[in-house]
Amino acid sequence: IISFDFFTCGKINPIVALDVLKKEIKHKRIIKKEFNRDAVDYYDDIYSSPGLKKFYLVKEVFEDFRSKVGQHVQILELEQFGKSLFIDNELQVAEKDEHLYSSTFVNSGLKLNPEKNNSAIIGGGDGGVARECISKGFNYIDWYELDPEVVDVCEKHLSKVGQKATKKNSVKCVWGDAFESIKKVEDSKYDKIFVDLNDDQYCIDLASKNINSLKRILKPNGTITAQV
C-alpha cells in the first residue's frame, strides 16, 4: 500500500500528479478522496472544450440532490452570478442576470402579437417566465413543468426569480411530461406558448419533434417563443 497526499493551490488540479504516478507505479487498484480546504470551490462547466477550460467559482452549495424524476439538481452561489440553478451539471439560470433572459423571452412574443388572454409555459422551472407573464397581465397561465422539486428549490433559494408564481390565482401548474399533457388540450387554446426547456440537445430535439403538437394548441396568429 502506498499513500500520497497531494496539496495544490488555486486552479491547479492534483489529478495531474496522480496521472503521472499511475503511469510509473502501475498499481492495479487506486482509491482517491478529494476535499477542499478553502471556503470556495471551482465548478467545471460541461461546455469546456479542447483549448478552453471554463470554471465557475462556487462560494456555497445550498442544494445538491437527484430529484424523483431523475434530474441532478443543484443550487450554488457563484462568485460572479449569485445564486444559480444547475440541472444535470448545466447552468440554467443565475439570479444576477436572469431578468434579461426572462423579460426578453416574454416581450419578444408580445411584440409580434399583443394578445395576452392566456399562455402556456413548457418547462421554465425557475419561475422567471411565469413571473413575466404575470407582470404583463396574462389572465390565465398554464405552466407545464416536469419536475416540481425544481420549482420548490427555486422558490426557496431563488425567490426573486419566481416571486411565488405558483401561488398566483392566474397560474395553473400541470406536473409531468409537458408534451404528454398537452395531448389533452383542445385545439387553438393559447395566445402565446413559451418553450423554456433545459439547455441540452435532447430538449432541443424534443421541442422540435413536438412542434406540430404545439402549433395545434396555438390560436391563429398566436406566437411560440422557444430557446434554441
What role is predicted for each listed range?
Residues 80, 90, 110:
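Residue-level marker of positions within ordered structural domains that often coincide
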Residues 26-87:
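Non-catalytic substrate-recognition/targeting regions of SAM-dependent transferases
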Residues 2-46, 70, 93-228:
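The AdoMet/dcAdoMet-binding core of the Class I SAM-like
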Residues 85-88, 195-197:
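Gly-rich Lys/Arg/Thr-decorated short loops/hinges at beta-loop-alpha junctions or inter-strand turns
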